[in-house]
Amino acid sequence: PSRKGFGYGVNGGMTRYAKVAARLLHKIPDNISFDYAAMTEPCAVAYSATIAPGFVRPGDRIVVYGPGPIGVLCAAMAKLAGAEVALVGLEKDKTRLEIAKSYGCEVIIGDASTWAKSVDGLGADGVVDAAGVSASLKNALSVIRPNGWISKVGWGPQPLDFSLDPLVAKNVTLRGSFSHNWPMWERVLRLLESGKLDLKPVLGGVFPIKDWQVAFEKMQSGEILKSVIRPE
């Protein structure tokens, strides 16, 4: 709970200069632009929630709740690991769900039970909750198979209004995922360098710093997933 990071507990990177310990720096490969390098952080969050635990196996069926930037990137990471992935959202999320299709994901509006249980009737092998609302965790417990896993990366202030008994009855592993570490950034940079992880669908625009408010509003409205702000 006391862990700090740039932009969380200490000042972030939206400044002309930043003082950083040399041991925290990463060398950007020559074939990665600064625009894409700036996207390493959310990619590392998704890597931490999806790949780092070692749960995902080729051929697994994974459900991801929440088609925001982290949810889409979690889905992309699970696809890279060889899983079949469905990203779940609401009617208002159609634009973001379309972006997920470019990563080869199934997209679902509403109930994911049919897709999750379509193979053997038992449910999904794993669920990533990137929505951070009480309902998404409740749905995750509904679609997960016995001995499956749930990775909760989404934050939310709402108290749980349902029983956790299904977690016990199904012997489900529930894992919280917060932030990332230095080696994860290095792995993400290698994925970008090799071209295995394509960020074109996620990066919706590059804006001069004077248009920072436009960049944030476009993300907030769901028009784009992520934006990059360049200093002038």
What do the predicted segments below correspond to?
Residues 1-25:
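Glycine-rich phosphate/adenylate-binding loop and adjacent beta-alpha elements
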Residues 54-58, 86, 98, 102-173:
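Glycine-rich cofactor phosphate-binding loops and adjacent beta1-alpha1 units
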